[in-house]
Amino acid sequence: MKLFKNNRWLLIPILSSLLLLVLMKTVLFLGYVPTESMEPTLKKDSFILGTRLYGDLTDGDIIIFERDGRLLVKRITASGGEAVVRNGITLIVPENCYYVQGDNANHSYDSRFWSDPFVKESRIKAKLLG
């Protein structure tokens, strides 16, 4: 490859960019926090990094998921089989689903208000790193 022999300085940025692209499509997930719903844990307008390879999720994990065509960031407060009380009614979280809330309860639109309060595992894009 004569092109790279004469321009080796191009090889490192090109390979680095390709590696980053592969990582972002397969392992990492770049997210954005558009509201104050996760403050003080995550500040409004901050970028966050998640992993697509997250294994088992547990209560307390912060996830990035899709709902109604939007990406949201919330904390898992109950998992499949657990009971939650919402508006005085006890709900059992279905298997492979999660009940989520924002850390800033006064500024979060989350499972407490949705007509279908559960996030299906198939909608989860990533788990927050860190």
List the predicted regions and their residue ranges.
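Extended hydrophobic leader/signal-anchor segments used for secretion and membrane insertion
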Residues: 1-130
